[in-house]
Amino acid sequence: TGTFAPIIYNGNPTGLRDDYATAAMCQSYAKRGYVAANVEYRLGWNPAAQTQSERAASLMKAVYRAIQDTKSAVRFFRNDYENGNTWGIDTSRIILSGQGSGGWVALGYATVDKLAEIQLSKFLDLSDPANPVALIDTAEIGDWDGYGGLYNVESNIGFSNDIHMVCSMGGGIGDLSWLEAGDVPMCAVHCPTDPVAIYTTGDVAVAAAGVITTDISGSYDVMTKANSLGNNDVLDPVNAGGDSYTLAAQAASANAQGMTDYGGTVVGAPVDNVFPFVTQNPFEASPWDLWDSTTTVYIASVVLGLPAQAGIDAHMSAIAQNPDMSPMKANAYIDSTMGYFCRRIVRATNLDGQNSIDEMSQLESSIDIYPNPASQSITIGSKEGLINTIEMYSATGELVRIASNLSSTKILLSNLNLKEGLYMCTVEINGQRVTKRVVIQ
């Protein structure tokens, strides 16, 4: 995170590799059994450049350099894998998870792979229309893999930098056209009120510099297109399921419909694979953040040699967006993010043991629940194997009924005594879980 500038200089009390949220996310991944690498990248751009095209070029170069550095990091781990595998990684399951600016890096990493994509008209200097000049010159800055250019130190040449999924926290992409069929699966969490990373599509602006670049797409529009291209088809069983995080995301998406995001666009119908974090704060962007004002002033004055007021200003700017910032709030949003991301990572990388969408569809079609709609009882039948566990969840994710230690192909649940509404019935068969909707009336 950090808007591609160093902490304090970016106007924020965050932007370090050891920020609370960043470290907590890495620790949470590690506790789940993942190898977590907290990767830094080159920073710096010029928001005070005189023209909008120069500001856009400066910011996009910063994103571009960060993508190059991240690809170099992936190649580093693949190189190590071939030479002892110090960290015990699985090269068939590499996930890029980015927070704030890191979300931009993750989405750009997965989508930028053609020269034409960085030579769109908005990335050209058109001061002389007869002689357009590319603002991102690969002869100077190198290609998107970090090879060539004047400033790159090429590393781990020959190793793949392929990844298998992208998770974004409040990120966006430079242009929606970058996203194409065949790109890796992706999911996101995002505040519709984010004033920098627009939730739908809009301009990126900084108060002191005005518009930086135009038509940047945030998580809502990115996931809408990724879903429509079929890139996220592998996640369909998760979205059809009844885990509490998916249900919470679906409820939040329904609540977000009709909202106006910071760019002035009215949010449309709910979209799978994005969890909108809607709070009571009108400019909320990073509800997972947590910082200490005293430490912020110390970093500004002692570490960076700036006036103490710079640290105070950074704290006040951030607290204006997140006035109820607290450990409880930060941890709650980190938990929601991890719960939402990890379920999708497991599915996208086949950690759940399902070999294909066809296999999952076959298992799902083998389960019958009737009558549906129901009243006081339902029968669950299986054609594929013995039912081990049945769980029923309300639309808010509350577990309302469980039957465990089962061993039958047909189970009757009676005396439900449930309120009218939509419920999710999760059936476990030989360690595999399928969720179906049940209506109680």
Feature locations, PLM:
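C-terminal outer-membrane/trafficking sorting elements
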Residues: M360-Q441
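Catalytic active-site module of serine/aspartate enzymes centered on a nucleophile-bearing elbow/loop
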Residues: S286-G353
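Gly/Ser-rich "nucleophile elbow"/oxyanion-hole loop immediately N-terminal to the catalytic nucleophile
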Residues: E54-Q68, S72-G100, L115-L120
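Short, surface-exposed "cap/lid" segments of acyl-processing enzymes
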Residues: T1-A24, S28
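Glycine-rich nucleophile elbow surrounding the catalytic serine of serine-hydrolase chemistry
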Residues: G98-G108
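Conserved alpha/beta-hydrolase
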Residues: G33-N46
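Active-site-adjacent alpha-helix of alpha/beta-hydrolase-fold enzymes
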Residues: N10-Y20, V184-T279, S286
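The feature captures the conserved acid-bearing segment of alpha/beta-hydrolase catalytic domains
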Residues: S127-V234
